[in-house]
Amino acid sequence: MHKLTLTAAVMAASVCPGAHAADILPLKQGIYVPANRPCKGASNAEIVNYRGGKSSFGSAQATCTIEKVTRNGNVFTVTDKCADIRTGGEIVGGPTLVTIANPTSFTRAGETYRYCGTKVQF
């Protein structure tokens, strides 16, 4: 039984390089900005946070939790539940298509994002 569990864990790691064991999406945890913008000085409106685990893509205004993910190759359909950080009120949205090129780059809503580390750069 332990051998089977270890084999499954090794296989999962090879399929999703860069992802932590508990991460649902194969992305590095941290800050992402539009690919055509510098990491340093990106505005709050441009910054997307990915914290891993069941956390979905957050922003300066919202925190989101993944409720469901389906995958077709490198295209993920993410259904999440978001709340306004200040009021706690629900932010309504639909499923989001995310194309993950590699552990540090993804495209969402026609915008390609790139990894900028774990902290916002001012």
List each model region and its residues.
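Short, solvent-exposed loop/hinge segments that bridge or flank secondary-structure elements
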Residues: A22-T63, I85-V92
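A short, structured loop/turn motif at beta-sheet edges
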Residues: D23-L27, E67-N74, T99-P103, T118
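Processing junctions and N-termini across compartments
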Residues: V10, V15, Y32-V33, G58, ...
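Short, hydrophobic/aromatic-rich segments at coil-to-beta transitions
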Residues: K28-I31, G53-S56, N72-T79, P103-F106
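Sec/Tat signal peptide C-region and signal peptidase I cleavage site
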Residues: C16-A21
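Bacterial N-terminal signal peptides that target proteins for export
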Residues: M1-A8
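Beta-sheet ligand-binding and adhesion/scaffold domains
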Residues: P38, T79-F122
